[in-house]
Amino acid sequence: MSSQEEIVIVDATNQILGRMSTHIAKLLKSGKKVYVVNAEKAIISGPRSRVLEGYSLLFTVKTMQNPYRQGIRRPRNPINIVKRTVRGMLPKNKLGKQIYRNLKAYIGIPKELEGKSMIRFDDADVSRLKGKYITVAELSRLLGGLKQ
């Protein structure tokens, strides 16, 4: 990588999480650093009950080695939900781990990123949806991640 890496700031407000994540994964694969701001305002399409059921499905699963101590770790806060979604779209090898380190997500807009130009993806806008949806912040509250 060059000494002057290109930084891309993505505003996740009213962006569909899956579609936004595909664009972020492509940017990361091209060697850019990506900062996602307003991660809690991203949108997941589908009725609230179905989305919650899908995310909470693996909370009760235990491992065979020590079922009392370990289970499958699932993200509960908005930052980790967004990062985990992008991680699933990256290569599953050493290169994928290195690429994943160039991704940062924030709740709100941090002071050092205020006033800088942010990009939004037109094909990931919530106006595409005709049905129901839930925000990542609302999902996080229902999973026990946000205390508001």
Swiss-Prot record:
Protein name: Large ribosomal subunit protein uL13
The UniProt record lists the keyword Transport: no
InterPro entries: Ribosomal_uL13, Ribosomal_uL13_bac-type, Ribosomal_uL13_CS, Ribosomal_uL13_euk/arc, Ribosomal_uL13_sf
One record GO biological process: translation
Family of the protein in this entry: Belongs to the universal ribosomal protein uL13 family.
Cellular component terms per the entry's GO annotation: cytosolic large ribosomal subunit
UniProt entry keywords in alphabetical sequence: Ribonucleoprotein, Ribosomal protein
Listed NCBIfam families: L13_A_E (TIGR01077), PRK06394.1 (NF005004)
Gene name for this UniProt entry: rpl13
HAMAP family given in the database record: Ribosomal_uL13 (MF_01366)
Subunit: Part of the 50S ribosomal subunit.
One example GO MF annotation: mRNA binding
UniProt organism field: Sulfolobus acidocaldarius (strain ATCC 33909 / DSM 639 / JCM 8929 / NBRC 15157 / NCIMB 11770)
Role noted for this protein: This protein is one of the early assembly proteins of the 50S ribosomal subunit, although it is not seen to bind rRNA by itself. It is important during the early stages of 50S assembly.
